[in-house]
Amino acid sequence: VLSAADKSNVKACWGKIGSHAGDYGTEALERTFCSFPTTKTYFPHFDLSHGSAQVKAHGQKVADALTQAVAHIDDLPNALSALSDLHAYKLRVDPVNFKFLSHCLLVTLACHHPAEFTPAVHASLDKFFSAVSTVLTSKYR
């Protein structure tokens, strides 16, 4: 459960990301593909090379979904319902992959914003990404 402080930390951090969200989403995806190669199996039709237009486009989708989640942080299930349906029923993404991507998002954000990435912000973002992952996998059951 996200506390008021967690929500504040997430909103403040995401506000500083601003126009870089798509770039960070792309970088996190690339990190995920490199660190967890099995995640590539969900993208057989993609050019997965560094700087690929397809990876950039999907990185932007990830960033847009997270921006939507931040904007509706008090109602994640409704905000992410359509995305949850897509991943559970159509794409059938293994839930562990959300954990992998979450980890790579944390690494990416820490690399780009080391001064702001305090232990409290790290914990808040980790809880937020976990909450998003929980919602995205909630329809698997």
UniProtKB/Swiss-Prot annotation:
Example of a GO cellular component annotation carried by this entry: blood microparticle
Domain Globin: 1-141
Binding residue positions for heme b: 87
Alphabetized PROSITE patterns for the sequence: GLOBIN (PS01033)
UniProt modified residues of type Phosphotyrosine: 24
Tissue expr: Red blood cells.
Residues with the N6-succinyllysine modification: 7, 11, 16, 40
Keywords assigned: Acetylation, Heme, Iron, Metal-binding, Oxygen transport, Phosphoprotein, Transport
Phosphothreonine modification, residue list: 108, 134, 137
GO biological process, any: hydrogen peroxide catabolic process
Pfam families: Globin (PF00042)
Residues carrying Phosphoserine: 3, 35, 49, 102, 124, 138
Family per similarity comment: Belongs to the globin family.
Function: Involved in oxygen transport from the lung to the various peripheral tissues.
This protein's name: Hemoglobin subunit alpha
Species annotation: Lynx lynx
Phylogenetic classification of the source organism: Eukaryota, Metazoa, Chordata, Craniata, Vertebrata
